[in-house]
């Protein structure tokens, strides 16, 4: 799958039948599924999500990228909304980083600064999210192990009003939506298994000119 095919895959709406395939799902950072041999207290599927932060399990959700430690992938992902080379955006990014959790970022910080979001952000948000999650995979052994422990299951983020990143069960119990986060996790899982890397359109990301805390990110 090349970068263009990867983008098409991430955008494509799907209907996922849990009766036809094994499913690993999560709706929030505290979600747990049935116990397994490796996870006798219940498989912590919620730790797969972006909003799971270091207050849950730091060894799984925190990671290194761009020369610093991130409490969760939600922090780094969100900074790109305000990532032009503008001192005002550095102030916004620092405000985002002051949030106590990924939930606080999404619920309170994002709406506060929404009007300053880069107008081109939606053009490359999937590529950026894939890059962020892949950095997490490369940096965090705990997260890698958790992701690989999902086996061959289809991973689904379950959110009612987010058909881009998640999916929601219909009247037949099938999950409907693009499930972008679930797909990104599965792409990274496959890359880890095959000792490769997901197909990320780094040319698009470089062309966007993404600045994090005043430094341009080179891909």
Residue positions per predicted region:
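Charged, low-complexity intrinsically disordered segments
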Residues: 1-219
């Amino acid at each position: 799958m090349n970068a263009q095919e990867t983008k098409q895959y991430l955008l494509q709406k799907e209907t996922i039948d849990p009766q036809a395939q094994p499913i690993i799902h999560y709706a929030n950072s505290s979600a747990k599924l049935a116990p397994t041999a490796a996870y006798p207290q219940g498989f912590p599927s919620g730790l797969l999500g972006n909003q799971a932060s270091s207050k849950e399990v730091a060894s799984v959700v925190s990671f290194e990228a761009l020369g610093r430690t991130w409490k969760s992938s939600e922090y780094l992902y969100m900074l790109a909304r305000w990532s032009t080379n503008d001192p005002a955006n550095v102030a916004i990014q620092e405000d985002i980083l002051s949030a106590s959790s990924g939930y606080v970022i999404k619920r309170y910080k994002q709406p506060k600064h929404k009007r300053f979001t880069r107008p081109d952000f939606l053009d490359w948000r999937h590529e950026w999210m894939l890059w962020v999650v892949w950095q997490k995979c490369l940096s965090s052994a705990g997260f890698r192990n958790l992701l690989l422990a999902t086996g061959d299951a289809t991973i689904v983020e379950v959110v009612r009003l987010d058909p881009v990143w998640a999916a929601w069960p219909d009247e037949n119990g099938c999950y409907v939506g693009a499930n972008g986060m679930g797909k990104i996790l599965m792409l990274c899982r496959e890359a880890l298994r095959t000792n490769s890397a997901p197909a990320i359109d780094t040319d698009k990301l470089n062309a966007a000119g993404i600045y994090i805390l005043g430094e341009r990110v080179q891909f």
